[in-house]
Design a protein with these regions (language model features):
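Short acidic-hydrophobic catalytic motif
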Residues: 2-238
Length: 238
């Protein structure tokens, strides 16, 4: 799928396209079979907005499992699929909601899994929010590299884009365009209406460049936004 163009003149979240939905068929070097991690591993930190101390454990998952979050601190340990149908809020982060259970600020974890080309994983968390760590997905990448990746028996499923796909949200001044292509390519333009930053562009031509090109990008905030965010009960852990 490419090029994908995201135009975000305001403070919007950059979305990632996963490799398993980005190409019509596996290209050279692209995994044919699904993958998961070799073993469980835990990382701890503080939630950006809630300020809660949280333990996050990555666990191997079976084929066709996808990405799921489990709130082990809640009765029944509810599981929330990392699916767009369960997105409940995108204010300063992405929050998944299912049957009353919530997990927030999931974007860096999911970006790391996509960047590592991991298809199946269960994330157990004992709080309402994923730890922010250094504000990027790099610590999650490095953590997953420590346990390694294992290939599974089932083949990956690839979505074939037959025609241009567009999305526009005038209220958020966001535009997205997906164009059929035999190559993986993502192009992003963002403009925060800042004289200091100006208009910024970024491109990714191979998901395996994610660690070196994208993973270290960190969440930031403008100084003039701090009071407003605090008034909205946010960035308690920032």
């Amino acid at each position: 799928m490419g090029p994908i163009i995201f135009q975000m003149p305001e403070n919007q979240i950059i979305a990632e396209a996963t490799p398993k939905t980005a190409v019509a068929k596996p290209a050279a070097g692209v995994p044919v079979f699904q993958t998961t991690i070799k073993d469980s591993i835990t990382i701890s930190g503080v939630g950006l907005h809630t300020g809660a101390s949280v333990n996050l454990t990555f666990r191997p998952a079976p084929e066709h499992h996808g990405y799921k979050f489990c709130r082990v601190d809640l009765p029944g340990k509810p599981v929330i699929d990392a699916d767009v149908d369960f997105v409940g809020d995108t204010e300063r982060g992405t929050t998944l909601v299912k049957d009353g259970a919530r997990v927030s600020t999931i974007e860096h974890v999911l970006a790391a899994l996509v960047g590592m080309e991991i298809d199946n994983a269960l994330m157990e968390v004992d709080g309402p929010e994923i730890p922010i760590l250094d504000g990027s997905s790099l610590p999650f990448i490095e953590l997953l590299e420590r346990v390694g990746i294992v290939e599974q028996s089932a083949e990956r499923k690839y979505f074939v884009l037959q025609e241009n796909l567009t999305y526009e949200d005038p209220s958020r001044k966001t535009e997205m365009l997906a164009v059929p292509s035999d190559e993986y390519r993502i192009t992003v333009m963002v403009d925060y209406n800042s004289d200091l930053l100006g208009t910024q562009h970024a491109s990714l031509y191979n998901v395996r460049e994610f660690k070196s090109e994208i993973a270290g990008c960190r969440t930031f905030v403008f100084l003039h936004e701090l009071e407003m965010l605090l008034q909205h009960n946010l960035i308690k852990g920032g």
